């Protein structure tokens, strides 16, 4: 055997995964998929099946996340990248900050632990997702999302057609359902609150667009997924859901415009057509009444607030609460509903509703601006890397996934609402995984 052949053999041997590490990686991927499905089904268990233990079920995903973190670090599946090092360092600093809040403000340790969980537990899970998922795993989660969209669309349609008092519109704790207009509910699907369903709609639309740009994905799945997504979008009664649809649609058509019309890409172009026809056609043909109701709600809301100003204020208001928060904040986790429940026995949102100012109020100027700065920088980096993927390989999947997760990283209530937290960090990890595995698309 020649020296060159020997070196090639050694290189090939180094490229092959260690059997034990590969087995552990597959287990972690399975845990990720289980966690994702539980994110969608958790609300149904809490409000319909097992309401007496709904508080405990809120944490039903956490053991699977803990096991995935354990396997990942035990088998060294994650590298110490700058992002991982920064996240670890910041999480340790927040532990000391929480200890300060316990001593200085007599804050309940459970509140601090809950707050730390919201800030970092699923951030580490996102880093695990980025490290272990291959492009085939990313594609599988996308397909699962489209499959789930079909029964979710049917459930949303039933909720939309049913009166607010119907069992299918039952709210956790027996509260009144949110309405679009008189007698018409804002659907929640399997989720306990409208914010969760909005995240489902936004994530499904991003997955739908990504599937349309993926060779080998069933066009029937894209078409039926588009029908389910259109139903969920039309019946959501949410301006934020339509914003997600608009952002994803604009990015999808921009991606389509820059890709070459080559014979080997005809299947991809057909997928984009199926997605567009299924989504827009379904909305206009089957849900004109829902669109009229949404237009009425938007008109009423515009008379009370300017959406553009509110969007801008959600960015700027974090810099205006420094005098109230001080350098070290008022209490890690104290501004959330779950944190206030642990601290006072009553669930109440005692601080700002918008994410940026509430994070600063909880953790202070130093740590609050640092944490939000990490989210802003990560968003910018993912956007740039996703653009590089489409320029270098015509791989649109990372950019389309960015269309959902970046708005959540920028302004989403990720440290306040459990489902938003799960969706935001899981899809951040999925986007990072798609970026990391973009080179695999050249081999397919």
Task: Label the predicted regions.
Residues 68, 399-444:
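Transmembrane alpha-helices of multi-pass inner-membrane enzymes
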Residues 292-365, 382-387:
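Long extracytoplasmic/lumenal interhelical loops at the membrane interface
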Residues 28-47, 62-120, 408:
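N-terminal hydrophobic segments of proteins, predominantly signal-anchor/transmembrane helices
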Residues 4, 154, 160-164, 253-302, ...:
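A membrane-periplasm/extracellular boundary helix in multi-pass inner-membrane enzymes
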Residues 143-170, 179-182, 189-258:
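Alpha-helical transmembrane segments of multi-pass inner-membrane proteins
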Residues 28-32, 37, 83-93, 128-164:
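Interfacial loop-to-transmembrane-helix boundary motif in multi-pass membrane proteins
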Residues 31-38, 382-414:
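Loop-to-helix entry and N-terminal half of a specific, functionally important transmembrane alpha helix
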Residues 137-146, 217-223, 260-275, 395:
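Membrane-interfacial entry segments at the cytosolic side of transmembrane helices
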């Amino acid at each position: 055997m020649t020296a060159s052949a020997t070196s090639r053999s050694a290189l090939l041997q180094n490229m092959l995964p260690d059997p034990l590490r590969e087995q552990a990686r597959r287990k972690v991927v399975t845990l990720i998929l289980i966690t994702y499905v539980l994110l969608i089904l958790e609300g149904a268990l809490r409000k319909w099946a097992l309401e007496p233990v709904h508080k405990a079920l809120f944490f039903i995903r956490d053991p699977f996340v803990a096991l995935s973190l354990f396997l990942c670090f035990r088998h060294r599946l994650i590298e110490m990248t700058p992002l991982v090092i920064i996240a670890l360092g910041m999480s340790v600093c927040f532990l000391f900050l929480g200890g300060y809040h316990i001593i200085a403000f007599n804050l309940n340790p459970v509140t601090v632990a809950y707050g730390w969980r919201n800030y970092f537990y699923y951030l580490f899970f996102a880093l695990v997702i980025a490290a272990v998922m291959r492009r085939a795993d990313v594609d599988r989660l996308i397909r699962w999302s489209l499959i789930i969209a079909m029964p979710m669309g049917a459930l949303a349609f039933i909720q939309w057609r049913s009166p607010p008092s119907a069992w299918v519109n039952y709210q956790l704790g027996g509260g009144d359902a949110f309405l679009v207009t008189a007698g018409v509910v804002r659907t929640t699907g399997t989720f306990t609150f409208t914010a969760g369903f909005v995240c489902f709609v936004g994530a499904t639309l991003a997955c739908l667009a990504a599937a349309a740009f993926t060779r080998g994905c069933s066009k029937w799945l894209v078409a039926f997924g588009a029908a389910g997504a259109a139903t969920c979008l039309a019946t959501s009664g949410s301006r934020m859901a339509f914003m997600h649809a608009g952002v994803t649609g604009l990015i999808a058509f921009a991606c389509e415009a820059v890709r070459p019309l080559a014979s080997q890409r005809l299947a991809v172009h057909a997928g984009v057509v199926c997605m567009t026809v299924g989504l827009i056609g379904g909305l206009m043909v089957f849900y004109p009444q829902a669109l009229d109701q949404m237009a009425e709600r938007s008109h009423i809301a515009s008379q009370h607030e300017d959406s553009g100003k509110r969007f801008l204020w959600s960015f700027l208001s974090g810099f205006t609460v420094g005098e109230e928060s001080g350098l070290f904040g008022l209490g890690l986790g104290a501004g959330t509903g779950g944190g206030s429940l642990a601290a006072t026995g009553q669930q109440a949102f005692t601080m700002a509703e918008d994410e940026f100012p509430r994070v600063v109020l909880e953790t202070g100027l130093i740590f609050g601006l640092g944490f939000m700065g990490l989210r802003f920088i990560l968003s910018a980096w993912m956007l740039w890397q996703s653009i590089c993927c489409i320029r270098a390989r015509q791989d649109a999947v990372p950019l389309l996934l960015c269309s959902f997760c970046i708005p959540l990283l920028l302004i989403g209530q990720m440290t306040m609402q459990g489902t938003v937290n799960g969706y935001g960090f899981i899809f951040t990890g999925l986007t990072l995984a798609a970026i990391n595995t973009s080179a695999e698309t050249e081999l397919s």
